[in-house]
């Protein structure tokens, strides 16, 4: 991420300010300088706030960022443009505030844009979703951004000196290690659940074991006394328990089957004795009833004689009944013939009346024919009547319009002739304008080249003078530095390392005496006198330091001058003096004026000719349009006259209205005549059809009557023959027999019932005699008592068996459940063993006493320290290295950092470092942290980094080393910005973003030293 442009409104001390970072060339190292409180850090706050809605330091709240001098009606807002992965984005964030005069807060706003084809297109327009979009785009949140892109005032030192708990919070945020702690909690909960499930499984096994039925059997009771925790023993005892339960069930089942067989025997004997008793009683009763039935035999014989006579007279009765039906049909046929004749007479009368109407209608036929002919001839006129009507209406208007168009056309022709006379033989000359323009352009180019060359020569002279001055300064400073180095070489440097050991030597002298062994060299002490002049050593050491400081300052100045000479050389190489014309500026300006005047004159002439041509074209177009309109008028006038002639010729009318009235009247008369004619024809056709139908009906009825008369004659002959056969002389004999017909059904039923019962008695008596033959009837009471005893015994044993069988099956189900629980428990213990071990390891119960999260954080910290030591070695002249404190870890320990001193070959606490050494270590650690986070995050693009304060604690040499480190960052393609009050940095860093304050508001500007 590389800043391009920052715009602040009412933000901190900036009421309305813009910072253009595009002025920083080639990721140049630059300094942000200004007085305390001027708002240098606020620039970092603005970037962080624009992206995440937070300041660059955790202590500053959003409400603290708004300017106290802001207009109460204006919001606080930041607009930040930046480049990421060769794509340009812009964010605009407006903070929430209470507008002056309102009581409710105006909500925050946030918009994210991306540049596409040179224009910004919106990507998000909501605060929450927009901030999330930025987090996903950059690949970091606000806390990670502070550690990677912006190292705020005092923030990057905090990570170096913090304890394990504080480092854990920082590293947890940067590397998202909370997920490992979440894994530990999940495993802990899973372990708790598994233990609860296992305990519940043991309880279920114990409950099932206690519920097993013992049947009051000593062997089963002995098996059930086993403790349920001994699941292996339970598995061994379950088959024994099931086998003993089956033995008990088999014994009860054998007793039950014996009782059932005894019950079935007595039940069968009792049933057979009861059936025999019922059969004997039934046989005696049937014999008595059969004797009584036989007494009805004479009456049945008389009934059969009557039924025979009724059967013989049936044919005669059918013939008599048929005669009555035929006589009824003959009477009905005669009635139908009479009705049909009357209908035919009425139809003939109706036809005569309609014939009269038809004759009257035909008398008007000639008149209707003439009207029909008129309609056919003028139908085409009537269908297009509006066209002819419009012709009568338009003809006068068209005549007037034609005369007017003729006058206008003549006027336009006269105007065209006048314009053509004005143009004459003149023509536009655009090639001459092009030639004059080219000449003017060439003259201007020659004038510009002369002016640019004069300016370039002046700039070149100035740069060469500056370069010569810088080279002279370098030569002078080089001479001074060589003299100082010669002077430094002549100093006596012996015993200088004893300068700060005076107190140490005094302590040793006070602790030893002459003749003792020296604790330093091991030799015998000969003298305790003063052999070292510490004042002289200190004086020489101060003089040497002063010379070294002067040499270092001169080297720094030479480096600055070399950098400035390089910058001047780049500017000189960019100066280009072009080849110019031999003419003077005065001659060129005169030629330029002449060509410009000629150009203006030609343009005016061309403009006049074009205007005349345009007017000519316009008049020509108007004449053409007028001619078209005149032609159209003449065509329409001719059409109107032709239509009027056509109408009057065909219709013989000269009035449209009269024609329409007569035409419609004729159409109405013809339609009425045609409808009436059709109606009469339809009526005649209907009458003819109806008469034909009635004539057919009459023929049918007459044929029926003849058929019925023949049937009646044949039926009479059959009646006479039957009466002769039955010896019947008259109708009285027949009527007497017919009277019996009302009782025939009753007589037949009585006869059939008698015969049926007679046969049933014979069959039943024979059956019962066969069932009771040779059989002895036993004592019923005695049999009943024995039956009840056997039944009660059987039911008792069946209930006992059912209970034992249910309990045995229940025992089997419970033992199967116990086996299933035990198998599941064994498998569960086997499967969860790895989870138990993993949960203990993750929770810190391992050989290092480290939780999973702390183990991961230690890994990342080691990576960060290794990366930081690469720079710290350079900055500390290979003296210091950061190391992680190797202590027995537990919980949150293991993240403390110590420093290893290669001079003493010992590690010591980080707080023992001086202020400058602490800054070196903090900077190296912060840069290492930044690079490791970038490696782990993958998508993060670190194209810039900003550092706030910390350089004031460094001496000259250390400052140079720190700057070299930051310059190395610049060479890797990263923009590096520094906030500092150190004046030396202003001389070392040529580009400065200066922040000025007038106690009311602040402003910024880029300047070069």
Curated annotation (Swiss-Prot):
CDD domains, A to Z: ABC_sbcCD
Keyword Flavoprotein part of the UniProt annotation: no
UniProt GO molecular function: ATP binding; ATP hydrolysis activity; endonuclease activity; exonuclease activity
GO biological process: DNA recombination; DNA replication; double-strand break repair
Signal peptide: none
Pfam families from the UniProt entry: AAA_23, SbcC_Walker_B
Residues that, per the record, bind ATP: 34-41
Keyword field: ATP-binding, Coiled coil, DNA recombination, DNA replication, Endonuclease, Exonuclease, Hydrolase, Nuclease, Nucleotide-binding
Coiled-coil boundaries: 176-364, 401-501, 535-805
Described function: SbcCD cleaves DNA hairpin structures. These structures can inhibit DNA replication and are intermediates in certain DNA recombination reactions. The complex acts as a 3'->5' double strand exonuclease that can open hairpins. It also has a 5' single-strand endonuclease activity.
Subunit structure: Heterodimer of SbcC and SbcD.
Family: Belongs to the SMC family. SbcC subfamily.
Protein name in the entry: Nuclease SbcCD subunit C
